[in-house]
């Protein structure tokens, strides 16, 4: 279920505006959590269509700046109906009827979260379009995304919750990302039989985990917060180099191979 709308406006091929909205419902969520409102807006200014551009239009054939900002939603959180618990039959051990048999019963393998709802992403895009000599077209864009409410399993819960062994999922994660997109296209018609077309693209992006339920970590370097998504953390941390045999003898023993003066000294 959903409702969508769009309004566009352009004035004299110079000033452009567009607004969109989506009001979407998803059966994946419990009643009261199913609907999300996701608006967006964009504006553009074609500077090269201004009258003051006439003197350089043969050289700079197109110049346009644009910006857009909006909110997007995601209801594909993995398993469907995350607000419902999943029960497996014959999984939980019971008591012995005799020495050779054991009772089995139902077991909750996933606790449903009635507050599960949409993941949301705030997206910003700022771009520039440049045309030179009616042959070379360059586009550059800078973009950011702030994704909140990422649906993930909690690491730990207090024993007072009574949910030992299986921790529930929740909209508890947050990731920020940013980057640039560049593209260039060159088209040249030499005559009716010969033409040249070249295209190049470049993309750079980075992301960072901002919020994640990690529980109590023994050391700060084991945390994924502040690192890119899927970064390897919690591994060995170098603490300099061994400078003498005396330092090796007085340091905790490293269990992964032989080492000597000049080798890496790992933090205990």
Where in the sequence are the language-model features?
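Extracellular/periplasmic, surface-exposed regions of secreted and cell-surface proteins
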Residues: 1-236
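Acidic, glycine-anchored loop motifs typical of Ca2+
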Residues: 250-252, 268
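Core catalytic ATP-binding domain of two-component histidine kinases
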Residues: 245-247, 254
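Alpha-helix N-cap recognition
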Residues: 243-245, 268
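Short, intrinsically disordered, charge-balanced linker/junction segments flanking boundaries
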Residues: 1, 260-268
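C-terminal segments of large proteins
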Residues: 235-236, 241-243
